[in-house]
């Protein structure tokens, strides 16, 4: 008679967490950066890693002001996005350059998460973050602003980033290299 052994709780947890593991890709525009977010998602999937995309422009959260802080009737429900970030293995942020900085959709999202999340620091502290931009201009200022923001929040921002613009076309080799850096 063969006895079938039931996996231990730890093994079940490891199997479940590996299957549920994902990279969260945030798109801070509904145009070319959303297309870039989808390219990242597809590339992660080809490497065997699940990816989820959130288009921040569809959140329709009000512009954060201190007057709205704590007003339950006007504050957005950040719990779903907080949960997605908290449970992700890494973040990829795709954002265009707006007037030399990151776009309002990203800045507003971070502002609301900072006041509405149960533990804001837990969302970003020690989290791997990859930055990417598809910008009409160079995109360097947006990347610097995002790097500063996420570093301030305690994230581990990957040194290399992806920049697409009129003089820098998409490179799958660059994307593959960046994905490997996230998966390490």
Predicted regions and their residues:
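N-terminal beta1-alpha1 ligand-phosphate binding loop
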Residues: 20-47
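Glycine-rich phosphate/pyrophosphate-binding loop and the adjoining helix
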Residues: 22, 152, 156-184
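Cofactor-binding loop segments of dinucleotide-utilizing enzymes, especially the Rossmann-like FAD-
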Residues: 28-30, 56, 134-136
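A generic structural motif
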Residues: 47-52, 155
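A structural preference for short, hydrophobic beta-strand core positions in alpha/beta folds
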Residues: 53-55, 159
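N-terminal beta-loop-helix "entrance" segment that forms/cooperates
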Residues: 57-73
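Helix-loop-strand module that forms the ligand-binding subsite of alpha/beta enzymes
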Residues: 73-153
């Amino acid at each position: 008679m063969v006895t079938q052994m039931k996996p231990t709780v730890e093994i079940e947890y490891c199997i479940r967490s590996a299957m549920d593991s994902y990279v969260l890709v945030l798109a801070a525009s509904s145009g070319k950066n959303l297309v870039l977010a989808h390219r990242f998602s597809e590339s992660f999937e080809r490497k065997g890693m699940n990816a989820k995309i959130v288009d921040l422009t569809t959140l329709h959260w009000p512009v954060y002001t201190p007057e709205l802080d704590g007003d339950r009737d006007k504050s957005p429900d950040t719990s779903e996005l907080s949960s997605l970030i908290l449970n992700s293995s890494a973040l990829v942020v795709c954002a265009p350059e707006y007037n030399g900085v990151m776009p309002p959709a990203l800045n507003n999202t971070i502002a609301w998460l900072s006041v509405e999340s149960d533990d804001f620091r837990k969302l970003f502290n020690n989290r791997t973050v990859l930055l990417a931009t598809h910008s009409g201009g160079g995109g360097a200022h947006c990347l610097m602003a995002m790097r500063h923001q996420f570093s301030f929040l305690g994230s581990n921002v990957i040194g290399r980033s992806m920049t697409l613009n009129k003089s820098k076309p998409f490179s799958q080799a660059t994307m593959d290299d960046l994905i490997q850096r996230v998966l390490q």
